[in-house]
């Protein structure tokens, strides 16, 4: 049994969090939201982006980053940042991995990154551009981990509605 955890630190845009919620629901990843959030959980954009998957989502809320770390002391943490020295696909993700992402407008605190430099990873992109969208970054990261784990508990084949393969 593999446990994959997605951590959003102070997310600001409800549509991003809704999209990420949907990604977590369809992959079985647990979502951790660290407050303060830039929106209300009842936000219509958040709900719409997550579609009707909210009842399939395992989600936890934390009052602060300190609260999160106190309640999850035994995780294997990977910090996704444009400032990372390591490429995300070159890391080995063990069971109980936590993929940690910062605010859309500011990323993760630099003191946190500095203290955990060996676990800071970057999704490669052009240097002259600032960053990828948060929900896209999470999807890239989640599927890299799941690829390394050989897609546990995920359907590998789809079905046509009118025809058979």
Label every model-predicted segment.
Residues 1-165:
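Post-transcriptional modification and biogenesis factors for structured RNAs
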């Amino acid at each position: 049994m593999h446990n994959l955890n997605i951590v959003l630190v102070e997310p600001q845009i409800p549509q991003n969090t809704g999209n990420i919620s949907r990604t977590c629901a369809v992959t079985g990843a647990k979502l951790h939201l660290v407050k303060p959030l830039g929106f209300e959980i009842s936000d219509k954009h958040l709900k719409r982006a997550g579609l009707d998957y909210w009842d399939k989502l395992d989600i936890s809320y934390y009052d602060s980053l300190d609260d999160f770390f106190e309640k999850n002391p035994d995780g294997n943490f990977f910090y996704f940042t444009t400032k990372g020295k390591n490429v995300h696909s070159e890391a080995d993700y063990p069971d109980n991995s936590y993929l940690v992402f910062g605010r859309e407008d500011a990323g993760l605190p630099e003191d946190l990154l500095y203290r955990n430099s060996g676990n800071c990873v970057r999704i490669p992109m052009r240097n002259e551009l600032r960053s990828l969208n948060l929900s896209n970054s999470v999807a890239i990261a989640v599927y890299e981990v799941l690829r390394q784990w050989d897609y546990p508990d995920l359907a590998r084949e789809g079905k046509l509605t009118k025809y058979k393969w």
